[in-house]
Amino acid sequence: MFNNDPLQKYDKELFDLLEKEKNRQIETINLIASENLTNTAVRECLGDRISNKYSEGYPHKRYYGGNDYVDKIEELCYKRALEAFNVSEEEWGVNVQPLSGSAANVQALYALVGVKGKIMGMHLCSGGHLTHGFFDEKKKVSITSDLFESKLYKCNSEGYVDMESVRNLALSFQPKVIICGYTSYPRDIDYKGFREICDEVNAYLFADISHISSFVACNLLNNPFTYADVVTTTTHKILRGPRSALIFFNKKRNPGIDQKINSSVFPSFQGGPHNNKIAAVACQLKEVNTPFFKEYTKQVLLNSKALAECLLKRNLDLVTNGTDNHLIVVDLRKYNITGSKLQETCNAINIALNKNTIPSDVDCVSPSGIRIGTPALTTRGCKEKDMEFIADMLLKAILLTDELQQKYGKKLVDFKKGLVNNPKIDELKKEVVQWAKNLPFA
């Protein structure tokens, strides 16, 4: 006995909210570097009846019956994950069950070092992730700085990773894991240099490639699999899949690591996996191996570099003065505005982006920059020529933010009053919506 009416009939209130969100996406210039659009096939997997099934354990070792097809789907996902990143099953294994990138990072770290083990990652203000051991002067912000003993390395004043500084910190701290791979670092990563440091202190090299995984799969950036012991990635960013994650582990270099990783995921941190997500990941990984996806990934990079050039041409300051990947960090200090205020202005005119720290920041709550990226816009068909319009709109938003701050004050609560019933906001929003609505949308 159950209700089998379609959502529009069964729950119109919820249906209307979902429709409004869809329309928001259609009418928005999405510059959030960690977002993308899934295709129809992936969305079909997410809504499939396979989500009815409970399947604690691993293929052919389940704690429930009736998992014959679930096993085959998970094995297919496993196979496609290795193929997507061109690594052999003899050398590498992969766990496809983590529910998210944060979960995958915690699970992998726990497997490698255990409670109170020493880890070393990049500071959040420099471009690291919360789960890389972040803490500040007031508290241990992430569970990874509480569960493990953490030290953080930083970028230099130009925004680049200083490998000598990383080495010196590693020699003094003697971590068991060094993490590279970041959330707002616009340059390629020296995995070979990190490997050499890890070997010097007898540490695992952990590469979190959540933001750049497609570039790795398509051989457009340095390859961490040559040097790393563990590689994690989300599947919903530039990979264009569902919100899930993968943990790769080098079992040839580290005998027994497969048992450590797998037992950390289940049963230490998770119970039954989300089978609909695993099916959706498998579906998207099939696309990753196609020439079509490689062309898409190349275009993301072309668009990002073009956007960076457009912004520099308009005299905006960029961290590291450009980008090697899909993301750009804009330094707003010369305009005397915060990323928080610009984010609010952009949100009011249907441009989605996020406030972001720059390397000189000490306050992560009110940062001096924004992070923007090109994956979602590229999925919607944008090319290099379109970056001129986007750069124009960003500059207009910056100048308007400065104007509103001078009129309404520096406090965010006061500043936001200037966004309401503002003809300039309405005019910019109309321009953005008209432009965005003409882009293809899945």
Swiss-Prot record:
Q: Which cofactor does it need?
A: pyridoxal 5'-phosphate
Describe the effect of C364 to A/S.
No effect on catalytic activity. Active in both reducing and non-reducing conditions
Q: Which GO terms describe its biological process?
A: D-serine metabolic process; glycine biosynthetic process from serine; methylation; one-carbon metabolic process; tetrahydrofolate interconversion; tetrahydrofolate metabolic process
Report the EC code(s) recorded for this entry: 2.1.2.1
Q: Name one GO molecular function term.
A: protein homodimerization activity
Effect of changing C125P: reported as:
Severe loss of catalytic activity characterized by a severe loss in substrate affinity
Pfam hit, one: SHMT
Q: Which cysteines are joined by disulfide bonds?
A: C125-C364
Question: Could you tell me what this protein does?
Answer: Catalyzes the interconversion of serine to glycine accompanied with the production of 5,10-methylenetetrahydrofolate, a source of one-carbon units used by thymidylate synthase to convert dUMP to dTMP for DNA synthesis. Binds to its own mRNA and to the mRNA of bifunctional dihydrofolate reductase-thymidylate synthase (DHFR-TS) in vitro; the physiological relevance of this interaction is not clear.
Q: Which NCBIfam families match?
A: PRK00011.1
State the similarity comment.
Answer: Belongs to the SHMT family.
State the name under which the record lists this protein. Answer: Serine hydroxymethyltransferase
Organism equals Plasmodium falciparum (isolate 3D7)
